[in-house]
Amino acid sequence: MTAILASILVSVLMLIFLLLLTKDAFSFSVRSFSMASIGRLLVECFPLCLGAFLLIYLGNAPKYAIDSYLSSTMQAYYTYLFMPCFVINLLVGFVLQPVLVKLTVLWEQKKNQAFLKYCFLMHLAALGISLVILLGGAILGCPVLSLVFGVNLNSYSAVLDVLLIGGGFFALAVIDQVILTIMRHQYAMLWGFGLASLFATVLSPVLVKSMGLMGAALAYTCSDAILFLIFLLFILFYYRKERCSLQSVPKM
């Protein structure tokens, strides 16, 4: 509880500091505001808030199972092996951020072919990054992690490989989450988050109890794969629906 309160306090202080630091860079005035509009905005953003929470939960569900069935040493090993997954997400973020505005403009202007092309290129870039890191992890991952953390992780190379595959699925799911948000179908994401979280909650303890760290890695990877596939199906469904609706509009 102390850590949570400290985190909240630091966040509030940082917010105040940044507002004071940047207040002269922006000039705007608010003459009036509508509580109804604010309420609608909060309702529209609710799936994004819940999704951010559940994304974190998907990564932590195997850790909860490890905490219940394995030793603290195994928990530490899993944390060490999980570190390279953040590299995939970091690099994919560099690919994703520059094209967000472009994707939004293309979708709003009904340029569906160009929109689909950019989506494909983003998935291709994420897949390429994931494959490069997976290859590097297979060759150097465990030796480097063993050197960094001062423990012998060489016997867990298969666990690292599975986790890196899961990291790739996670990055693809994040891309699809952004695409669905741009398409204004963020509520559809709740199905993906719900099913993936249910899988992680139910099967993480079973897999960890029977397979140890490999079970935790499989639970993480399968949960992210489920999330990615559901999001991808929704994207294809809504894209096809949008294209059909445009084709049905009579030309003037």
Where are these regions (language model features)?
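Alpha-helical transmembrane segments of polytopic membrane transporters and translocases
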Residues: P47, P62-Y64, A76-V92, A125, ...
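Helix-loop junctions and terminal segments of transmembrane helices
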Residues: L81, C85-K110, I179-I182
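Interfacial transmembrane-helix starts/ends
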Residues: L42, T79, K111-G128, L135-L140, ...
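Interhelical loop/hinge segments that connect adjacent transmembrane helices in multipass membrane
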Residues: M1-A3, I16-G59, K102, L106-A114, ...
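Membrane-interface junctions at transmembrane-helix termini in multi-pass inner-membrane proteins
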Residues: M1, I165-G192
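Helix-loop interface residues and adjacent transmembrane-helix termini in multi-pass membrane transporters
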Residues: Y69-S72, I182-R184, S210
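Interfacial segments at transmembrane-helix termini and the short loops linking adjacent helices
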Residues: S72-M74, I139-G168, M214
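Hydrophobic alpha-helical transmembrane segments
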Residues: M1-D24, G194-F199, L213-F237
